[in-house]
From Swiss-Prot:
Gene3D superfamilies, A to Z: Cytidine Deaminase, domain 2
Gene Ontology CC entries for this record: COP9 signalosome; cytoplasm
Description of how the protein assembles with itself and partners: Component of the COP9 signalosome (CSN) complex.
Residues reported in the UniProt entry to bind Zn(2+): H161, H163, D174
Assigned EC number: 3.4.-.-
Entry keyword set: Cytoplasm, Hydrolase, Metal-binding, Metalloprotease, Nucleus, Protease, Signalosome, Zinc
MPN domain ranges (all copies): 75-215
Disordered, as annotated region: 210-248, 381-456
UniProt short sequence motif JAMM motif, positions renumbered to this chain: 161-174
Domain notes: The JAMM motif is essential for the protease activity of the CSN complex resulting in deneddylation of cullins. It constitutes the catalytic center of the complex.
Function: Catalytic Component of the COP9 signalosome (CSN) complex that acts as an regulator of the ubiquitin (Ubl) conjugation pathway by mediating the deneddylation of the cullin subunit of SCF-type E3 ubiquitin-protein ligase complexes.
SMART domains per UniProt: JAB_MPN (SM00232)
Source taxonomy: Eukaryota, Fungi, Dikarya, Ascomycota, Saccharomycotina
Protein's name according to its UniProt entry: COP9 signalosome complex subunit 5
Length: 609
């Protein structure tokens, strides 16, 4: 039986005398704040587990668990031990962690009274204990008993580890580890904690398991048989369950369900726990355990983090922040330090957007962005069928592992960006004139393409209207005047030189000039067209020189209006700022990876100086 169905409400705020039923087990819930006010129970009754011996002498001699493979059916966990396990698992993030369980054996129950961490080597899908971990395990327990002057009789009763994001169950390696430990130091218990689901749902996701002896002919009771069936995934939902698992765990899921069974879990507290919980209730306390409890008025759940923090952040983003490798347990950071970092990070995009809207975009950046926006609309019309085929062809083998996501490994055939950096370099190297021609072609193609082929999921009508509005912007006045028109003029000049002399000249202008000079009745000399052409060229050259002088005089003059106009053109007018903001908004809505690379603070310094 999975912990999703059995232990979803293991920390509910109800009376100790109230039981509720799940499909196959009973979980007794205890109010962690009002233990001393429970009716009909003396405070000393809470410490009954601490007065028990490490193991029942009769059970130690007879070892009934060797005869009955389902002998242990319940697990008691101290509230402080539960908090220590949850905090340890959360600080590990997407990396599996491991620790030991310390407690006692009483009747058919295993009592977990304390836990401690192990220095192990963990990954996203497994955890390995080295020689240092075993040495630490023995030394910790020895020193713990020495500090208690022999009064502490707890022994190691099991181990715990985490499954970040993929539920509480035992994989093949977990089953082997648990079977090995049960073979030489039974009674032994395995606990699995999922820190990701704990943060998402605000309830501790936990499960307690034991394995069947190898080669045993088990005939489990109806309760344990039901648990075994629920550990095994149903055929109808098997594929859906496997999709949320890492690739290395997909084959393990449900494959070993007949080799172990789960135990009922009950959370208990004691007078020692009450002292710590009382300190946690102090508003001035800043301990790392404080936010694991909340004084909730709801009777159906206890949240894992305070309500005001849940309103201000999305808890799953905190896990993603850890999975990026930003967390280092050696530096003393906790899960709540990362939450504060996330809050700061959440305000960054607005600051960046405000920074962009106050700056004038370079014309080259705008032209490149404009071409990519047009390409995006074209790509949405041509790849609709390909996306549909890809969505139906993806199987279980193509599911991404958490490690794959961190390495930015994409599935085959799925296009994640519009164009690579190499494509950008090629576009810049082809020449400004050719880029202008390609931009005109893109405009024509977008206008001619039928809009009804655009997939509404990737480009809706509002987005297309914004792209169409961008066609009215003249992004490249300077670019076209100095590059494209220059290219066209040089091309026309070559053709012009190859024409005959009488076709090369503008006959109407030349004849008008000849008549203006009073030579209407005279025959035009053969060399007059060349003389007239030279005069026209000198006039054009003089006109250009005069225009440059006038423009320089206006900029350097004493007129205040001219200076304001010059500064306005340098820093950008309100219209240009609005245009820049529209470009950023449109680019972010489309999701261009290249544009996101450009609209960062570092890129701003490179683009705009």
């Amino acid at each position: 039986m999975t912990c999703l169905d059995e232990l979803a409400h293991s920390l509910e705020s109800k009376s100790d005398t109230t039981n509720f039923k799940t499909r196959n087990s009973k979980i007794k819930t205890i109010d962690l704040y009002q233990q001393n006010e429970l009716s009909g129970k003396h405070p000393q009754d809470q410490d009954k587990f601490y007065r028990l011996p490490a193991i029942d002498p009769i059970a130690r001699d007879k070892k009934p668990w060797k005869e009955d493979i389902n002998y242990f059916n319940k697990c008691y966990i101290s509230s402080l031990a539960l908090m220590k396990m949850c905090t340890h698992a959360q600080t590990g993030g997407s990396i599996e962690i491991m620790g030991m369980l310390v407690g006692k054996i009483s009747g058919h129950s295993i009592i977990v009274m304390d836990t401690y961490r192990l220095p192990v080597e963990g990954t996203e899908t497994r955890v390995n204990a080295q020689n240092e971990a075993y040495t630490y395990m023995v030394e910790y327990l020895t020193e713990r008993q020495q500090l208690s002057n022999g009064k502490n009789e707890e022994n190691i009763v099991g181990w715990y580890h985490s499954h970040p994001g993929y539920g509480c169950w035992l994989s093949g390696i977990d089953v082997s580890t648990q079977s090995l430990n049960q073979g030489f130091q039974d009674p032994y218990l395995a606990i699995v904690v999922d820190p990701v689901k704990t943060l998402k749902q605000g309830k501790v996701e936990i499960g307690a398991f034991r394995t069947y002896p190898e080669g045993s002919q088990q005939q489990p009771s109806m309760t344990n048989k039901t648990r075994k069936d629920q550990n095994k995934p149903h055929n109808s939902g098997a594929n859906a369950n496997r999709k949320i698992l890492p690739k290395s765990k997909q084959k393990d899921f449900g494959s070993h369900a007949d080799k172990y069974y789960s135990l009922d879990i009950e959370i208990f507290t004691s007078s020692w726990d009450d002292k710590v919980i009382e300190m946690l209730k102090d508003e001035d306390s800043l301990t790392w355990m404080k936010n694991l409890l909340v004084d909730s008025n709801n009777n159906d759940k206890i949240l894992g983090i305070r309500k005001d923090e849940i309103r201000s952040i999305e808890l799953i983003k905190n896990y993603e922040l850890i999975s990026q490798g930003n967390h280092n347990a050696d530096e003393g950071e906790t899960i709540f330090d990362l939450i504060e970092q996330l809050k700061i990070q959440a305000n960054t995009p607005k600051f960046m957007l405000d920074k962009l809207t106050t700056m004038k975009f370079d014309s080259t950046f705008e032209s490149v962005l404009y071409k990519r926006l047009l390409k995006k609309t074209q790509k949405s019309t041509t790849t609709k069928k390909n996306r549909k085929d890809l969505s139906t062809d993806i199987d279980d083998e193509t599911m991404l592992d958490e490690s794959d996501l961190e390495k930015n490994v994409g599935t085959g055939g799925i296009e994640t960006s519009i164009s690579s950096d190499d494509d950008d370099e090629e576009e810049e190297g082809e020449g400004e004139g050719n880029s202008s021609s390609r931009r005109d072609n893109n405009n024509n193609e977008v206008e001619e393409g039928p809009t009804d082929e655009v997939d509404s999921e990737y480009a809706n009508e509002e987005l297309l209207e914004e792209v169409g509005a961008l066609e009215n912007y003249n992004f490249n006045d300077l670019l076209e005047n100095k590059s494209a028109n220059k290219f066209l003029r040089s091309e026309q000049k070559i053709k012009h030189k190859n024409r005959p002399i009488h076709q090369r000249m503008d006959n109407s202008s030349m004849i008008s000039e000849w008549n203006r000079l009073g030579h209407q009745q005279q025959h035009m000399p053969a060399d007059y067209p060349y003389q007239w052409s030279s005069n026209v060229a000198n006039l054009v050259k003089t006109s250009k020189t005069n225009r440059r002088r006038e423009r320089l005089h206006r900029l350097q003059g004493a007129s205040i209006d001219n200076k304001k106009q010059f500064e306005l053109g340098l820093h950008g007018s309100p219209e240009s700022k609005a245009k820049s903001a529209n470009l950023v908004k449109l680019a972010k809505s489309i999701g261009l990876n290249e544009v996101f690379d450009l609209i960062t603070l570092d890129a701003q310094q490179k683009l705009f100086g």
